[in-house]
Amino acid sequence: MLFRYLVWLFRFIEVKNVVSISLLVIGSNYLTTAISNNTSTTISPTTSSNYLLTAISNNTSTTILPTTTSSNYLTSAIPNIISDKEDDTPFSTDKTVSDGLSPITLYRAIRSTLNDTMTDILTRPYRPTTVIFHSDTPQPVKNATQGNIIKKTYRQVLTFFIQPNPLFPCFKNHEVFLNLANILNTILCIILIKNV
């Protein structure tokens, strides 16, 4: 289930006009895959004991905003400021967010999110935390209140997390989320996009 979730995660990374992509998978094994001249849209990273097929489609993806919570229920991480009716649009793969998030920023945000999750679990196991980030900042912005596009996408992603989905079980226990964080930390990827 967790690896199916990872497939879903990487499928929504927005990639446009890519000439060359270098994918570095951090784990027990290292694999570098290059895509040149826009002739392929499939990346297949490999870990030591599992195989993960990742498809990145041009102009059809939605940027993923990582979220983290150390409380027992993920719903507690939804701020009241983004509970407007216009933000309750169901999550759809057809919607493209024009935020222009760079892969390096995504990598830093994921790493920071995982670090915050580890710290919160060990020292403050019941304090809810939300992490979202802007494309023009090198690090995540905690409890951000500006940016309608970011808030709307954040709401959509959280809604997709909470509702039952066959891809992965609902994250209602912080231990389950921590296990996912450990897996992500093991196969954390740096995606380098050149000539975008």
From Swiss-Prot:
It comes from the Viruses. The keyword Chloroplast does not apply. Disulfide bonds: none annotated. Induction: Expressed in the late phase of the viral replicative cycle. Sequence repeats lie at residues 28-48, 49-70, 71-92. The keyword Flavoprotein does not apply. Keywords: Late protein, Repeat. Belongs to the asfivirus I196L family. This is Late protein I196L. The lineage of its organism: Viruses, Varidnaviria, Bamfordvirae, Nucleocytoviricota, Pokkesviricetes.
